[in-house]
């Protein structure tokens, strides 16, 4: 029974350490400014479409 908490703690420590493959994959994935620009642009596009489509249903594509 004494080994169980030690075993669980070791499993948690091993699971929390990122591997090299994960770090290399996410380093060059997407530049942060581009991601932030897309995050701001998407709600703006949705709000523009909502304004257009609310009074005129025919303008929705």
Swiss-Prot record:
Expressed by the venom duct. Residues 1-21 form the signal peptide. Its main location: secreted. It comes from the Eukaryota. Pfam families: Chi-conotoxin. The modification 6'-bromotryptophan is found at residue 58. It is found in: Secreted. Residues 22-48 form a propeptide. One of its GO terms (molecular function) is toxin activity. One of its GO terms (cellular component) is extracellular region. The cysteine framework is V (CC-CC). This is Conotoxin 3. It comes from Conus textile (Cloth-of-gold cone).
